[in-house]
């Protein structure tokens, strides 16, 4: 019996520090809850010429945020007001702060890489990314709703 208690005590002395070290955390926020495929469900622009519902006009934005920090997807901006249609690849990377601010790094020069998005959830508990920023007098408001997890 004494030998068994000594063995148990020895295992605890050796095993407990190993367990504690294995559970060490990171200062970086977890990206796993944010990862998933998102699509624009609200996409408005407004400026001197008025407000435009970009989804109704034919614009789309779909982006997949992988758990490893990479992105894929596509942005299509419908032609309007003499501006031609724009198509852009959303390939790149994404990061999130502990305050749930998501930013994108992409080679495509679009508002997506220059707008911080806030991660949260809608009234039904579905993950959303919301962005709202003014670029050269045009306000862009976007809500991306997660369709699936990655």
Report residues per predicted region:
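N-terminal helix-cap/turn-to-beta initiation motif at the start of protein domains
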Residues: 24-39, 64, 149-150
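An anionic, turn-rich surface loop/hairpin at beta-sheet edges
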Residues: 55, 101-119
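Short, solvent-exposed coil/turn segments at beta-strand boundaries
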Residues: 62-72, 96-100, 117-129, 146-150
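N-terminal glycine/threonine-rich, aromatic-flanked beta-hairpin/loop signature
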Residues: 52-100
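Bacterial N-terminal signal peptides that target proteins for export
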Residues: 1-12
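C-terminal motif of bacterial Sec signal peptides marking the signal peptidase cleavage site
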Residues: 19-22
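Edge beta-strand at a domain terminus
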Residues: 86-100, 132-150
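Generic short beta-strand segments
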Residues: 39-46, 70-79, 107-108, 130-134
